[in-house]
Amino acid sequence: MRHGYHNLTNYRMLHIAKDSPFFEEYAQAKNTESFSCEVPSDWACQLDSTWRYLFPAKVNLPDQGWKIHLSSCPTEAQLLLDVVGGFLVKKRVAFKHLVSYGSFLRLNGKNANRSSSGKFITIYPGSVGDFLALLEELEGLLGNFHGPYVLSDIRYKEAPVFFRYGGFRYLLEEDGKGVSRLAIRRPDGSLTEDQRKPFFVLPDFVSVPFGIKKQVDARINPSDEFELLFAPYSILESLHF
């Protein structure tokens, strides 16, 4: 079972080449410079054409929880990975990162799905306490780095550090029409969709930790000042996701 998982539609879109009607593993279709991150020999490594998954031995992750996304600009990406990778290895925290500059450019391109764009590194904390501690430490480490906003998430403070609640493992449910979709588990054990939208979605059964309550409240209940930014306009529809 893959530890991280994909939006199925996004996964297909990432494997269709320009001017081609066929899906193809991107790693086979085009060679691009790879990102590198050294980990100890007792870490597990899984690789696909977009992501490299890195997991320390004897660390059991929950199926879901609060996860952290880091964004970057192309010129800083390898340096950011060097800094964060070394930090997470010392902490023995599971994470994944984009495998190459090619995958980085595709996920940040204008045709990429907005719900996944901007994500360069995904971090899987083992507990809520670990999650809150990692947010604060990463904010200190990455204060001089730059990256785009991850639309599905909330920014923690000023650094390119973002978070959302969602699945850590590959769980699927059917939507009633026979279509499979990514899922998370409710407290009663039933599955519900893990909504990956180009905006933040808080599952209705999730309690918000005190350490991020201010940021979550500000996103869910925007101030009047924020609403005034859109006052002269009527939003009809999106041109593109």
Where is each model-derived feature located?
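Phosphate/pyrophosphate-binding loops and the adjoining catalytic core of nucleotide-dependent enzymes
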Residues: 2-241
